[in-house]
């Protein structure tokens, strides 16, 4: 059985780590390289960097950041945001990222998942999905930092992404993002029934109990959190201790 992973998420905007609620009201919480090093030393299993302003203008800033992080952090880390081509992914992997996440660009061009998986291997390709529950109880996929409803059904998109060669799903509940009210267990379980690849749960972590709950009640292999770690509300060591006490295997 895969050991469960605790994964801090660093949303990066203009070279700084930021945090908001429901994808808005962003506040600056520090330098990405310092934050990565602190989390690595605190014992996290992996890191995720999402460049939320990623445009062609600041692509080099991101590559530079990845290089600095790779020099100081010796655990797997994923980079996402603005990855539009095989060449973009190649740059991030060469700079030292272990995995690269695609989101809006994969919706616009699903072939990108296949091309990247064929070139670098599925293990490098993470499909990040932002989803929200609709009035009819289905979930829709959102893009553009969670602002635009694609009208695409979440479960249909998960199935397609897996078939195209995704190696991992990073699933964010936009209803839960930043609320600290717990992960979206229903959505995770629905997705897990269709995806035989690792799933990272994101959106809603508010305390250690939520981190334990996601692993006890869903097949998620990783739990991603931002605010509770950035603001020191919960430590990684305490989270792992709580998980062990509940019989959850951690790294």
From Swiss-Prot:
Coiled coil: none annotated. It comes from Streptococcus mutans serotype c (strain ATCC 700610 / UA159). It holds the Pfam family His_biosynth. One of its GO terms (cellular component) is cytoplasm. The active site is at 11, 130. One of its GO terms (molecular function) is lyase activity. This is Imidazole glycerol phosphate synthase subunit HisF. PANTHER family: IMIDAZOLE GLYCEROL PHOSPHATE SYNTHASE HISHF, IMIDAZOLE GLYCEROL PHOSPHATE SYNTHASE SUBUNIT HISF/H IGP SYNTHASE SUBUNIT HISF/H. Its main location: cytoplasm. It catalyses: 5-[(5-phospho-1-deoxy-D-ribulos-1-ylimino)methylamino]-1-(5-phospho-beta-D-ribosyl)imidazole-4-carboxamide + L-glutamine = D-erythro-1-(imidazol-4-yl)glycerol 3-phosphate + 5-amino-1-(5-phospho-beta-D-ribosyl)imidazole-4-carboxamide + L-glutamate + H(+). It is an enzyme of class 4 (lyase). The keyword Amino-acid biosynthesis applies. Pathway: Amino-acid biosynthesis; L-histidine biosynthesis; L-histidine from 5-phospho-alpha-D-ribose 1-diphosphate: step 5/9. SUPFAM superfamilies: Ribulose-phoshate binding barrel. The keyword Amino-acid biosynthesis applies. Heterodimer of HisH and HisF. Belongs to the HisA/HisF family. It is found in: Cytoplasm. Its EC number is 4.3.2.10.
């Amino acid at each position: 059985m895969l050991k469960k992973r605790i994964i801090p998420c660093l949303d990066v905007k203009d070279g700084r780590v930021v945090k908001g609620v429901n994808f808005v009201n962003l506040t600056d919480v520090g330098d990405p390289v310092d934050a990565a090093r602190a989390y690595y030393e605190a014992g996290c299993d992996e890191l995720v960097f999402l460049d939320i302003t990623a445009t062609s203008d600041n692509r080099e800033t991101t590559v530079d950041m990845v290089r600095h992080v790779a020099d100081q952090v010796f655990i797997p880390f994923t980079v996402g945001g603005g990855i539009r081509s095989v060449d973009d992914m190649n740059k991030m992997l060469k700079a030292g990222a272990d995995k690269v996440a695609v989101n809006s660009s994969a919706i616009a061009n699903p072939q990108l998942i296949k091309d990247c998986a064929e070139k670098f291997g599925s293990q490098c390709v993470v499909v990040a999905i932002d989803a929200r529950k609709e009035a009819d109880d289905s979930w829709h996929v959102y893009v553009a930092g969670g602002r635009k409803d694609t009208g695409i059904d979440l479960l249909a998109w998960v199935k397609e992404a897996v078939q195209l060669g995704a190696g991992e799903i990073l699933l964010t509940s936009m209803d839960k993002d930043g609320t600290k009210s717990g992960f979206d267990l229903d959505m995770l379980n629905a997705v897990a029934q269709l995806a035989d690849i690792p799933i990272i749960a994101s959106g809603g972590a508010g305390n250690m109990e939520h981190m334990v709950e996601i692993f006890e009640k869903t097949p998620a292999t990783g739990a991603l959190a931002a605010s509770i770690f950035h603001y020191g509300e919960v430590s990684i060591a305490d989270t792992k201790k709580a998980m062990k006490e509940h019989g959850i295997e951690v790294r």
